[in-house]
């Protein structure tokens, strides 16, 4: 955990957490993010994007809202996918800067201070995390690197970890890039960064600590992976 006294500050920040059946982690994650935001931002909001959870995720968040109105929930009636959750967060954020992290404990949100400091040093529009040491299987690492190589070949986008679920983004990026289309799987991350680069926004990277995910998301299912490759080629033809 970082020293809050030395942490970089920001005037206003919208943060959102995509969540699907996260009853085991969501309460702790929301509390940790809230504690950091109190010390980091003068004005802030914390949104949980509840993607059709069938467990107690919604109830846990609503109980937290009763204690702090900075916390909000956006409910999807059905499970629409990771891409849909990110879009709900992006397009609902009200402050000039937006951050998001996965809600299953993979990241330490107190590292947001490093993102803010990096943005101020570089005047970047997007600060993208990359894993210091990723706590996943070698197969996942290899497939991710193959994907990143393909994205670089097709679009010239070179980042260490396209799918890293910890980013700081200027709201003007969301307002100016072509509307995001992806719904399921992790293709949304590639689509977003490709469109941001194509529009001329500055992207910088910063290392983040990674902790093992509690469960496997839909982004790793074979049909979703295949569809992601199809979507990538479609995007290449359009751009």
Over which residues does each language-model region extend?
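Acceptor/aglycone-binding surface of glycosyltransferases and processive sugar-polymer synthases
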Residues: 76-92, 97, 109-186, 211-230, ...
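Short, well-formed alpha-helical segments that are part of the catalytic scaffolds
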Residues: 22-37
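Catalytic donor-sugar/metal-binding loop of nucleotide-sugar-dependent glycosyltransferases
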Residues: 184, 193-210
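Conserved donor nucleotide-binding strand/loop of the catalytic core
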Residues: 44, 58-92
């Amino acid at each position: 955990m970082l020293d809050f006294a030395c942490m970089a500050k920001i005037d206003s920040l919208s943060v959102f957490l995509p969540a699907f059946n996260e009853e085991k982690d969501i309460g702790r994650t929301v509390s940790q993010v809230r504690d950091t935001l109190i010390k980091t931002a003068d004005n802030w909001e914390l949104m949980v994007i509840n993607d059709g959870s069938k467990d107690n995720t919604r109830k846990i968040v609503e109980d937290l809202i009763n204690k702090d109105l900075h916390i909000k929930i956006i409910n999807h009636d059905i499970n629409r996918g990771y891409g849909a959750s990110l879009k709900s967060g992006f397009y609902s954020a009200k402050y000039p800067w937006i951050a998001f992290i996965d809600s299953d404990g993979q990241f330490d949100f107190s590292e947001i201070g490093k993102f803010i400091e990096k943005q101020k040093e570089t005047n970047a529009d997007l600060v993208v995390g990359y894993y210091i040491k990723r706590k996943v299987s070698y197969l996942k690492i290899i497939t991710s690197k193959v994907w990143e190589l393909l994205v670089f070949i097709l679009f010239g986008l070179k980042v260490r970890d396209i799918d890293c679920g910890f980013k700081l983004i200027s709201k003007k990026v969301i307002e100016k890039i072509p509307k995001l289309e992806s719904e399921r799987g992790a293709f949304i991350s590639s689509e977003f960064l490709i469109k941001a680069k194509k529009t001329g926004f500055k992207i910088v990277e910063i290392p983040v600590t990674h902790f093992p995910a509690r469960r496997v998301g839909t982004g790793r299912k074979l049909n979703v992976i295949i569809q992601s490759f199809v979507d990538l080629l479609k995007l290449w033809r359009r751009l």
